């Protein structure tokens, strides 16, 4: 949900709602994304952004979206984009979406990583367009009580038969959050340490699906240690 319209909720037709939809807000970001990019670069952190290609008109604006992604890469060094909100409901939409992926990949010399969210809608998945990046496989939240580490590991294990594990993103959450939702469940995430959770998805691309500032000191130290081993 965003504020492009009075009531928010714009998930396609972005350019019709606001021609400068993907331009950084001039008051909130008077220098564009330069301060964020500079801060990240100074700490050796690669910058990534969420991006939703415009699905309206069977991806009529696919070239405009591709140019936006390339501009963000060239201007700010954003080399990772999570592509979300995609609706591939016709063959024409699929063809144009593939053209977007091809254009960004070719013109960046494969230096831009495209993470395709495949959690909803009709989208590319395990058997198509895998060469263009990685797959964001699932959404899980302790807020809703639907995150179970053993299920995440099982999904990774079963899908690895068809997709190289390193091409998929699998999540680990802060095990100390929302423990009351799981009560006495012996498989609750709160019964694991953070480094154990990281190790359970280490064969894939581990996704720290959390606010890092909310980690307890001990879990933060354990993650720091195991991430050092992973690197």
Residue ranges: model-predicted function:
Residues 93-96:
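Short glycine/threonine-rich loop-to-helix capping motif typified by GTGT followed
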């Amino acid at each position: 949900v965003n504020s492009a319209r009075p009531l928010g909720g714009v998930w396609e037709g972005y350019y019709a709602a606001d021609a400068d939809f993907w331009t950084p807000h001039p008051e909130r970001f008077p220098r564009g994304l330069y301060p964020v990019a500079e801060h990240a670069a100074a700490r050796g952190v690669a910058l990534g952004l969420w991006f939703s290609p415009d699905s309206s008109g069977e991806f009529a604006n696919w070239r405009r979206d591709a140019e936006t992604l390339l501009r963000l890469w060239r201007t700010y060094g954003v080399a990772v984009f999570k592509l979300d909100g995609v609706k591939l409901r016709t063959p024409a939409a699929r063809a144009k979406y593939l053209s977007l992926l091809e254009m960004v990949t070719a013109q960046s010399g494969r230096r831009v990583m495209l993470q395709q969210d495949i959690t909803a809608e009709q989208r590319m998945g395990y058997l198509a367009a895998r060469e263009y990046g990685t797959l964001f496989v699932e959404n899980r939240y302790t807020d809703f009580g639907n995150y179970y580490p053993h299920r995440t590991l099982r999904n990774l294990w079963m899908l690895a038969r068809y997709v190289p594990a390193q091409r998929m993103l699998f999540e680990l959450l802060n095990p100390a959050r929302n423990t009351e939702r799981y009560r006495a469940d012996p498989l609750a995430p709160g019964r694991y340490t953070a480094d154990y959770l990281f190790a359970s998805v280490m064969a894939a691309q581990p996704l720290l699906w959390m606010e890092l500032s909310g980690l307890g000191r001990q879990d933060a130290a354990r993650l720091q240690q195991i991430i050092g081993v992973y690197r």
